[in-house]
Amino acid sequence: MAGILFIISAPSGSGKSTLVSELRKQVSGVEFAISWTTRPPRGSEENGREYNFTSREEFQRMLDTNVFLEHAEVFGNFYGTARKSLEEARSAGHDLLLDIDVQGASQVRARMPEAVSIFVMPPNPRVLRTRLRNRSRAEGVVNEEEVYRRLNEASKEIENYREYGYILVNDILDRAVAQLEAIVLAERYYRNGEVIAYRSRRVLEVAAACLQFNSQERLKPVLEAFGILGSTSQQQLDFGEDSDREDPAQDGEDPNDD
């Protein structure tokens, strides 16, 4: 049985890493490609677990020797996925999940148009701002300049949502995890005929509702909030008031999520 290549992308702070972590607990046979990066570890991150941390010089050497399937520069740091991850997953007949940004996703889709692409959106700028501030606080200092830079970049990234096959809005963690799981199981069913038992109809319905072309009405308030639809401009985005409250919908969110 051939493995499926899944791509998942999201603006920084959208909770993507948490979704991936929960998916791997609930669905077997999904390999996770650990990216290489030149950024320093955050918090409790460990080399070889969340990322393979390396120097800019070593990253450039790997780039020069064609090690990477895709690579990108994000917020001044380099990220890349090694080709070896895909080769090993294919050899084992496993699915492979790439947690990569919109630049890297575009590169992979150009080479492998059969890949299943998933984009994760935060519900609105206020929630994203809270998440980014909480992460900054977890690192020991609230850098408002960095928070706003990432908020503005998020709007630009969300503009690329039409390039993805599936769209998730990560407003309620359990629901978003269930949707991600349904997408993986539905793709296995359609591509490989994998049996999903008594849950089959419900799983297929949940996945179908997340297809980009079925999501326009569901996404409309999110796109309007980020100034992508309607009259709201980038300069008019409402990022909310200062708040020390945690985002109640994301108790399990990983503060290290890129």
Language model feature labels by segment:
Residues 9-11:
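P-loop (Walker A) phosphate-binding loop of NTP-binding proteins
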Residues 17:
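Walker A/P-loop
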Residues 25-33:
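Post-Walker A helix-loop "phosphate-sensing" segment adjacent to the P-loop in P-loop NTPases
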Residues 14:
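ATP-binding Walker
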Residues 39-44, 90-95, 107-162, 166, ...:
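A glycine- and Lys/Arg-enriched "phosphate-lid" helix/loop adjacent to the NTP-binding pocket
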Residues 35-96, 102-106:
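ATP-dependent small-molecule kinase phosphotransfer cores
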Residues 156-258:
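NTP-dependent small-molecule kinase module
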